[in-house]
Amino acid sequence: MSEEIILEARDIWHSYEENDRFSLQGLDLKVKKGSKVAFMGANGSGKSTLMNRLIGQKIAITSNKPQTTRNRIQTVLTTEEGQIVFVDTPGIHKAKNKLGEYMVNIAERSLNEVDVVLWLVEPSTFIGAGEKHIIEQLKKVKTPVILVINKVDMVKKEEVLTFIDAYRKECDFAEIVPVSARRGDNTDELVNVIMKYLPYGPQFYDEDTITDQPERQIVAEIIREKALHSLNEEIPHGIAVAIDQMKMNHKVCHIDATIICERDSHKGIIIGKQGSMLKKIGSTARFEIERLLDCKVNLKLWVKVQKNWRDSDYMMKNFGYREDEM
């Protein structure tokens, strides 16, 4: 079902009087609560970890490296009450190249295309320039903004309360919800709070759908995640992963992928002594891809230099960073 048809059906739904809506809910029209919810958060705040926790499966990659999330990733949680489409956006930051501009544009556009915004922060009373910049952006948003305090299992309760007071003075949040994405503490309550603010309307996806990402893209992101975990600080910003081939043969998925970097010196580091680093990235990625696809995987990796690819619209589109597909 196209998004235009869904939005038209939602308009028809809202045209009914409240009593008529109540009567219609008894019919199998899939008219429950449901809409899109944007995830925002600084590097290392745990956005992807929380989103994976909420849907019960790993879709978004996790790393403490800056700007890990590059595309707008949508995951779907369907309950008896309705459907939440979580939109994991790249963080808002000062762009240094076209890739950075692409990421910031996606993040800012997403804020105007959802019914609820979740802003994920770590428990600290220090509100710096970066946080204040995001707060100013959120004040322009017409939809409810829920402040989610992650990693509360790492601090004392009194510190969390002090932190809540500090942020309340900065912005009028619709709700403030403390959670631990790592342990799953209070995440069910977060879902209940989100549902309070969602409109009634048809669901965007079938009940068994958990993401809009194609398998090839998820596989590419898994490989990139393992590279992020293994490589030095200066390299991850300049790498991308292209899936050259992915096919099933005799119950084994054969995948050929290329890790793209920007410098010849980086290529040597990614390969490692006698191929040791590339083997490490490949083995850890293969294990997780097998869990995702539920089959044996034969993964072959290559490394290729594409200088300044982050400033090339053509190469960015080749590597899956396309605004026209948003």
Task: Report the location of each language-model feature.
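Conserved C-terminal guanine-recognition region of P-loop GTPase G domains, centered on the G4
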Residues: N105-A174
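The feature captures the beta-strand-to-loop junction immediately N-terminal to the Walker
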Residues: M40-A42, S63
